Amino acid sequence: MAKRDYFCFVVLFLSSVSAVIDDPQNKQVYVVYMGSLPSLLEYTPLSHHMSILQEVTGDSSVEGRLVRSYKRSFNGFAARLTESERIRVAEMEGVVSVFPNINYKLQTTASWDFLGLKEGKNTKRNLAIESDTIIGFIDSGIWPESESFSDKGFGPPPKKWKGVCSGGKNFTCNNKLIGARDYTSEGTRDLQGHGTHTASTAAGNAVADASFFGIGNGTARGGVPASRIAAYKVCSEKDCTAASLLSAFDDAIADGVDLISISLASEFPQKYYKDAIAIGAFHANVKGILTVNSAGNSGSFPSTTASVAPWILSVAASNTNRGFFTKVVLGNGKTLVGRSVNSFDLKGKKYPLVYGDNFNESLVQGKILVSKFPTSSKVAVGSILIDDYQHYALLSSKPFSLLPPDDFDSLVSYINSTRSPQGTFLKTEAFFNQTAPTVASFSSRGPNFIAVDLLKPDISAPGVEILAAYSPLGSPSEEESDKRRVKYSVMSGTSMSCPHVAGVAAYIRTFHPKWSPSVIQSAIMTTAWPMKPNRPGFASTEFAYGAGHVDQIAAINPGLVYELDKADHIAFLCGLNYTSKTLHLIAGEAVTCSGNTLPRNLNYPSMSAKIDGYNSSFTVTFKRTVTNLGTPNSTYKSKIVLNHGAKLVKVSPSVLSFKRVNEKQSFTVTFSGNLNLNLPTSANLIWSDGTHNVRSVIVVYTT
């Protein structure tokens, strides 16, 4: 009887599923990716997209089906399709992939001083080219009236600029903010603050006396304040869709931006041909445009980063030497030090403390709520929580502090020791963090889930407690109850580290405007400050910070670089078993995969390999080629630094001699060591001519 009931259920279930699939009213938005634009003069993308829809729907009127048409920089469209229509489109000639219109998420000044790019005459700049540099920000829009985007002292936009200012009602561009496009129907004005913050972090003007209610007071500025900004709004207050992202890439590439900064990430890693950011960034790379992308805020577990393509510079978040703390003063006079950005000054007035996890609102009204778990109250004066994981300052709409476990236990002991426990908050102060830089707990980690032999993220940069411009329409704590409005705010996330590296890339480009995206990426990675794990565990190693912490001063003059072009990336995809037919569409030209390409031999600045096995020895080989961008008649000697589990690294040849600039030399690295499930085996290869130290991270792991 049970089996019969189960069988009936399955039949009914499958019947209902079939009915849903075939229901013409059940349409969803899908992205149809068709690769590069055909070079045929008579080809019109929009007409082709419409004809595809007409064919699969059997209807000549399909205007209501088409959502987006990608026709300026690559080929494809977004449309409302039923499941059966999706299947038919996916099977059509000329289609690379069809994937759901998934949602991407926002990955939500002293930081530049920490990086060595100080304000003033001592910082080397090439202002003429910096002013000719255009950074495209794909984000939540921008607040054009911010002082960070004033065009005082700016000349007209560069002649290469082909974009427009279509920001919507009461939105005006200028000679600093030269372009604006909206894909949300809200207008390009930033309603959240995120896009304003990221744009000003990379390219904002120097604004004196910027602070968050007096906290972090100083000069807020971007890494390249003389550069131009183009804002592409893809994030509404509701979502950031794949279809909108691809439209922004399509326009930004054709508009003539020099760099793209995108502080967004999908919830999970996607295959490259189904990832809007990977698709857009690939076509940007082909046009000589580097895409810098946040690694994600999914925390310190392995394989959480979704920014995993080799043609993207993926950025983890780390802290700086400035942090914020908030003191809690108890009724017995003891002071405890926690983390938060608390702008509220209680003037020393003490309030009753109540400890627990679940309370009726009437029990906490007018009191300070103390809890081990995240909680909120509309009527409590403020809250104190335990910080056993975050290790960075959060904002709240009320007085708030995160106490380290020992101090939290001390607070609970005090509460239990008296009938009338009391306490108060002091306003947040800044402190000097001697342990910086360390990777933030929220920053997403590798290993790379899509291409296991490619190390991601690539680099780490400041992303903790960053002060930058903000939208007056946004809540600084992102809480609806927070009615404060500010021009500058403090935010943390890989969303903040991404524009730091975009600013660094733009800074490098001002000295080397003809450098390709891969050369700039290599220069940033091979000159990074070495970092070490700040906590035990597999995901706290190179999988947390990649090559290390960005050093833009050294990156201007890297010595040797690892170059990549379109053909290298296509060969890499061959090694991932993409078919020649698919790659022909992506590349826009004939592709023949040789069948013996190993992804680990992509000429990437880092080296990584996943090996099957456990507690066993291994030997793996990497092949690389470097280009001399230093001085002619130079000789580089190899040096190896062995880390955990590494036994031996052989480099052949161990010495590279160059007679001229732009000369290339190839070498092989043979790495031997022991596999360990708990830690990757790693080493550093350093090529040095006595002036330049070109460092590559080598990581071998098993899972």
From Swiss-Prot:
<feature type="glycosylation site" description="N-linked (GlcNAc...) asparagine">
    <location>
        <position position="416"/>
    </location>
</feature>
<dbReference type="GO" id="GO:0006508">
    <property type="term" value="P:proteolysis"/>
</dbReference>
<dbReference type="Pfam" id="PF00082">
    <property type="entry name" value="Peptidase_S8"/>
</dbReference>
<keyword id="KW-0964">Secreted</keyword>
<feature type="glycosylation site" description="N-linked (GlcNAc...) asparagine">
    <location>
        <position position="577"/>
    </location>
</feature>
<feature type="signal peptide">
    <location>
        <begin position="1"/>
        <end position="19"/>
    </location>
</feature>
<comment type="similarity">
    <text>Belongs to the peptidase S8 family.</text>
</comment>
<dbReference type="InterPro" id="IPR000209">
    <property type="entry name" value="Peptidase_S8/S53_dom"/>
</dbReference>
<dbReference type="InterPro" id="IPR045051">
    <property type="entry name" value="SBT"/>
</dbReference>
<feature type="domain" description="Inhibitor I9">
    <location>
        <begin position="29"/>
        <end position="106"/>
    </location>
</feature>
<feature type="glycosylation site" description="N-linked (GlcNAc...) asparagine">
    <location>
        <position position="433"/>
    </location>
</feature>
<dbReference type="InterPro" id="IPR010259">
    <property type="entry name" value="S8pro/Inhibitor_I9"/>
</dbReference>
<feature type="active site" description="Charge relay system">
    <location>
        <position position="139"/>
    </location>
</feature>
<dbReference type="InterPro" id="IPR034197">
    <property type="entry name" value="Peptidases_S8_3"/>
</dbReference>
<dbReference type="InterPro" id="IPR015500">
    <property type="entry name" value="Peptidase_S8_subtilisin-rel"/>
</dbReference>
<feature type="active site" description="Charge relay system">
    <location>
        <position position="495"/>
    </location>
</feature>
<feature type="glycosylation site" description="N-linked (GlcNAc...) asparagine">
    <location>
        <position position="615"/>
    </location>
</feature>
<dbReference type="Pfam" id="PF05922">
    <property type="entry name" value="Inhibitor_I9"/>
</dbReference>
<feature type="domain" description="PA">
    <location>
        <begin position="350"/>
        <end position="411"/>
    </location>
</feature>
<dbReference type="Pfam" id="PF17766">
    <property type="entry name" value="fn3_6"/>
</dbReference>
<protein>
    <recommendedName>
        <fullName>Subtilisin-like protease SBT4.7</fullName>
        <ecNumber>3.4.21.-</ecNumber>
    </recommendedName>
</protein>
<keyword id="KW-0378">Hydrolase</keyword>
<feature type="glycosylation site" description="N-linked (GlcNAc...) asparagine">
    <location>
        <position position="170"/>
    </location>
</feature>
<dbReference type="GO" id="GO:0004252">
    <property type="term" value="F:serine-type endopeptidase activity"/>
</dbReference>
<feature type="glycosylation site" description="N-linked (GlcNAc...) asparagine">
    <location>
        <position position="217"/>
    </location>
</feature>
<dbReference type="InterPro" id="IPR041469">
    <property type="entry name" value="Subtilisin-like_FN3"/>
</dbReference>
<feature type="active site" description="Charge relay system">
    <location>
        <position position="194"/>
    </location>
</feature>
<dbReference type="InterPro" id="IPR037045">
    <property type="entry name" value="S8pro/Inhibitor_I9_sf"/>
</dbReference>
<keyword id="KW-0865">Zymogen</keyword>
<keyword id="KW-0645">Protease</keyword>
<feature type="glycosylation site" description="N-linked (GlcNAc...) asparagine">
    <location>
        <position position="633"/>
    </location>
</feature>
<keyword id="KW-0068">Autocatalytic cleavage</keyword>
<feature type="propeptide" description="Activation peptide">
    <location>
        <begin position="20"/>
        <end position="107"/>
    </location>
</feature>
<keyword id="KW-0720">Serine protease</keyword>
<keyword id="KW-0732">Signal</keyword>
<keyword id="KW-0325">Glycoprotein</keyword>
<feature type="glycosylation site" description="N-linked (GlcNAc...) asparagine">
    <location>
        <position position="360"/>
    </location>
</feature>
<dbReference type="GO" id="GO:0005576">
    <property type="term" value="C:extracellular region"/>
</dbReference>
<dbReference type="InterPro" id="IPR036852">
    <property type="entry name" value="Peptidase_S8/S53_dom_sf"/>
</dbReference>
<feature type="domain" description="Peptidase S8">
    <location>
        <begin position="111"/>
        <end position="556"/>
    </location>
</feature>
<dbReference type="InterPro" id="IPR023828">
    <property type="entry name" value="Peptidase_S8_Ser-AS"/>
</dbReference>
